[in-house]
């Protein structure tokens, strides 16, 4: 059974809550176990929590769940670009999948509501990567 850790952003919690629930349902459907969840203030705050989960022997992969909505400045782009870069770096550093389930940047609130399946897609990617990496080890 694949053991997942979830890192969930509290910012835009109404949306990340729906993303989290869909992700949990999909994990159960795939036969994966969500072993641990860590709530962080926002997507930019995820890397340290991800690193903490990746250090645990009982976590096979981490799923990120966040939602970054466009504002009047380029803040949303900076947040997502930096979070995505660090997330990829951590995956390579620890040799474990970290799936990007962050919706944004450059989207309106209505577009964000249409993208709540990003968490589900991230679970799918994480489980597939764990299984495929085990096949070649």
From Swiss-Prot:
It catalyses: (2S)-2-hydroxy-3-oxobutyl phosphate + 5-amino-6-(D-ribitylamino)uracil = 6,7-dimethyl-8-(1-D-ribityl)lumazine + phosphate + 2 H2O + H(+). Its EC number is 2.5.1.78. PANTHER family: 6,7-DIMETHYL-8-RIBITYLLUMAZINE SYNTHASE, 6,7-DIMETHYL-8-RIBITYLLUMAZINE SYNTHASE DMRL SYNTHASE LUMAZINE SYNTHASE. Keywords: Riboflavin biosynthesis, Transferase. (2S)-2-hydroxy-3-oxobutyl phosphate binds at residues 72-73, 115. GO terms for biological process: riboflavin biosynthetic process. Gene3D superfamilies: Lumazine/riboflavin synthase. Belongs to the DMRL synthase family. One of its GO terms (molecular function) is 6,7-dimethyl-8-ribityllumazine synthase activity. Catalyzes the formation of 6,7-dimethyl-8-ribityllumazine by condensation of 5-amino-6-(D-ribitylamino)uracil with 3,4-dihydroxy-2-butanone 4-phosphate. This is the penultimate step in the biosynthesis of riboflavin. This is 6,7-dimethyl-8-ribityllumazine synthase. It comes from the Archaea. Forms an icosahedral capsid composed of 60 subunits, arranged as a dodecamer of pentamers. The active site is at 75 (proton donor). InterPro entries: LS, LS/RS, LS/RS_sf. The keyword Aminoacyl-tRNA synthetase does not apply. One of its GO terms (cellular component) is riboflavin synthase complex. Pathway: Cofactor biosynthesis; riboflavin biosynthesis; riboflavin from 2-hydroxy-3-oxobutyl phosphate and 5-amino-6-(D-ribitylamino)uracil: step 1/2. 5-amino-6-(D-ribitylamino)uracil binds at residues 11, 43-45, 67-69, 100. It comes from Methanococcus maripaludis (strain C7 / ATCC BAA-1331).
